[in-house]
Structures are given as structure tokens and as C-alpha cells.
């Protein structure tokens, strides 16, 4: 019987071992595998999410870079346009100043010409008066030759001084 006992003990031990394996599998190993699977799925999900966010961040970075370049080009265009407008304004001011200077110069020339004509008319008038006065004196015979010259020189000197 010792042999059978041993055999029965071995079978009971084997049966206890199998029950223990079943209990361990059911209550420890299977939940552990489920937790490990969930953990693996979460890690994969987090990795996929991180890759997606990285791609989005790179796209946003590219968009920001493009927007910055566009803003730079726009600013350069605005600055260039402002420079051109300022040059146009300066050129217009120069042209206007030249025109004004020409007007002032022409006005001054016209005024000088008018005063010159007036002076010539005044000289002609005076010369006529002098000639008449001189002729009267000569006709009257009042002046002798020397007095006539002195009188004439006197009158001409006075006219030059005016």
C-alpha cells in the first residue's frame, strides 16, 4: 500500500499543483496579462498621439515661419513703397520750388524791365525839357558861349546823379 499511497499522494500533489496553476492563472496571470495589454495599448496610443502632436507642432512651426516670411516680405514692400513715395514727394517739392523760383525771377525781370522803361522815359522827358530850356536860352541870346557850356555840363551832371 505504500506504493499506492505514494501514488495517491503524487496524484493529490499533482492535482493541487494543477488547481494552484488554474487559480494563479485565473486570478493573477490573466489579470496581469490584461493590465500589461492595457498598458501596452496605452503606451502605443500615447506614442501615436505624441507623433500626431509632433507633426501638428511641426506644421504649426512651418505655418508660423511662412507667416513670418510673408510679413517680412510685406514689410519690405511697404518700406520700399514708402521710400518711393518720399522720393516722389521730394522730387515734386523740388519741381515746385524751381517753378516758384522761375516765377519770382520772371517777376523780378519784368519789374526791372518796367523800371528801366520808366527811367528811360523819365530821361527822355528830362532831355527834352533840357533841350527846350537850352534852346530858349540860346534863342534869347542871354548866354555867351562859355556860360552855355557850363550850364549844359551842370545840367548833364545833375541828370547823371539822378
Swiss-Prot record:
User: Which Pfam families does the UniProt record give?
Assistant: ATP-synt_B (PF00430)
How the protein sits in the membrane?
A: Single-pass membrane protein
Predominant location of this chain? Answer: membrane
Q: Which keywords has UniProt assigned to this entry? A: ATP synthesis, Cell inner membrane, Cell membrane, CF(0), Hydrogen ion transport, Ion transport, Membrane, Transmembrane, Transmembrane helix, Transport
Tell me a GO cellular component.
Answer: proton-transporting ATP synthase complex
Q: Superkingdom, according to UniProt?
A: Bacteria
Briefly state the protein's biological role.
F(1)F(0) ATP synthase produces ATP from ADP in the presence of a proton or sodium gradient. F-type ATPases consist of two structural domains, F(1) containing the extramembraneous catalytic core and F(0) containing the membrane proton channel, linked together by a central stalk and a peripheral stalk. During catalysis, ATP synthesis in the catalytic domain of F(1) is coupled via a rotary mechanism of the central stalk subunits to proton translocation. Component of the F(0) channel, it forms part of the peripheral stalk, linking F(1) to F(0).
Q: Which HAMAP family match?
A: ATP_synth_b_bprime
Q: How does it assemble?
A: F-type ATPases have 2 components, F(1) - the catalytic core - and F(0) - the membrane proton channel. F(1) has five subunits: alpha(3), beta(3), gamma(1), delta(1), epsilon(1). F(0) has three main subunits: a(1), b(2) and c(10-14). The alpha and beta chains form an alternating ring which encloses part of the gamma chain. F(1) is attached to F(0) by a central stalk formed by the gamma and epsilon chains, while a peripheral stalk is formed by the delta and b chains.
Q: What is this protein called?
A: ATP synthase subunit b
Q: What is the lineage of its organism?
A: Bacteria, Thermotogati, Thermotogota, Thermotogae, Thermotogales
Annotated gene: atpF
Amino acid at each position: 500500500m505504500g506504493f499506492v499511497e505514494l501514488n495517491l499522494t503524487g496524484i493529490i500533489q499533482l492535482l493541487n499543483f494543477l488547481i494552484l496553476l488554474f487559480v494563479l492563472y485565473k486570478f493573477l496571470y490573466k489579470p496581469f496579462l490584461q493590465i500589461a495589454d492595457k498598458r501596452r495599448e496605452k503606451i502605443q496610443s500615447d506614442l501615436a498621439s505624441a507623433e500626431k502632436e509632433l507633426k501638428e507642432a511641426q506644421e504649426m512651426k512651418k505655418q508660423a515661419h511662412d507667416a513670418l516670411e510673408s510679413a517680412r516680405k510685406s514689410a519690405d514692400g511697404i518700406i520700399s513703397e514708402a521710400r518711393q513715395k518720399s522720393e516722389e514727394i521730394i522730387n515734386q517739392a523740388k519741381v515746385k520750388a524751381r517753378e516758384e523760383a522761375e516765377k519770382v525771377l520772371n517777376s523780378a525781370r519784368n519789374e526791372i524791365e518796367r523800371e528801366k522803361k520808366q527811367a528811360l522815359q523819365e530821361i527822355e522827358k528830362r532831355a527834352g525839357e533840357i533841350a527846350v530850356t537850352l534852346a530858349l536860352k540860346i534863342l534869347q541870346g542871354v548866354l555867351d558861349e562859355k556860360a552855355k557850356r557850363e550850364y549844359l555840363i551842370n545840367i548833364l551832371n545833375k541828370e547823371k546823379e539822378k
